[in-house]
């Protein structure tokens, strides 16, 4: 299995977890590093996607969607300072008990703190304004890692909704090439069946 197939399977399993925990909408501020997640979210027909190139306005738009629907809404952006523009809306979501699922993409570990472009410290960047932070593992397509990816998606959305609702943050280090295989038939339904009926929290 090549890198493109591995990344596609791993991220698809994660998105399946989001979907099965109630995510129906996602607001995407596109950028290079977020390409695979953005395209795979858009491919998922059960999730309605919106595009807003301005991260600050995207975050407040997602906040409004989540308030209106009372359901978790995904926010996705690229690496670097893009994620900092989410900060005001995340603070408001935390105070207002709104279940945002914030997905930031990041340079892989070997490109951090070495002067690579669009790289900054993204770990715990929203501090105590989110109720859960997860630094996702690099994509692998073993059965164990596909289960892990699915579980993190399901857990993230479930945590966001758990009373009192609040935003959660998952950070994805991703290596190039960043284009997923959109024609690939994945087996994420295996994770759905495996975790069916299990308590997420």
Predicted segments with their positions:
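Thiamine diphosphate
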Residues: 1-79
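Conformationally flexible catalytic loops at phosphate/diphosphate-handling active centers
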Residues: 5, 49, 159-201
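Short gly/pro/ser/thr-enriched loop/turn and capping motifs at secondary-structure boundaries
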Residues: 35, 56-59, 82-84, 107-112, ...
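Active-site-proximal loop->helix
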Residues: 40-42, 64, 89-91, 106-128
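Short, acidic/small-residue loops that bind anionic groups at enzyme active sites
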Residues: 48-54, 96-113
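Short beta-strand segments
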Residues: 76-78, 99-106, 127, 137, ...
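Conserved thiamine diphosphate
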Residues: 119-166
């Amino acid at each position: 299995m090549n890198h493109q197939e591995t990344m596609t399977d791993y991220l698809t399993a994660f998105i399946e977890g989001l979907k099965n925990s109630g995510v129906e909408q996602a607001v995407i501020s596109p950028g290079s590093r977020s390409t695979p997640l953005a395209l795979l979210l858009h491919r998922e027909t059960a999730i309605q996607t919106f595009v807003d190139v301005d991260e600050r306005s995207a975050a407040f738009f997602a906040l409004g969607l989540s308030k209106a629907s009372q359901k978790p809404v995904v926010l996705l952006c690229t690496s670097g300072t893009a994620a900092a523009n989410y900060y005001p809306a995340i603070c408001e979501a935390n105070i207002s008990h709104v279940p945002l699922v914030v997905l930031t993409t990041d340079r892989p570990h070997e490109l951090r703190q070495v002067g690579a472009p669009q790289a900054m410290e993204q770990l715990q960047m929203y501090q105590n304004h989110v109720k859960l932070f997860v630094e996702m593992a690099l994509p692998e397509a073993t059965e164990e890692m596909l289960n892990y990816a699915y579980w993190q998606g399901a857990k993230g959305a479930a945590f966001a909704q758990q009373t009192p609702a609040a935003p959660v943050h998952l950070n994805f280090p991703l290596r190039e090439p960043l284009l997923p295989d959109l024609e690939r038939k994945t087996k994420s339904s295996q994770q759905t069946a495996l975790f069916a009926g299990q308590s997420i929290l």
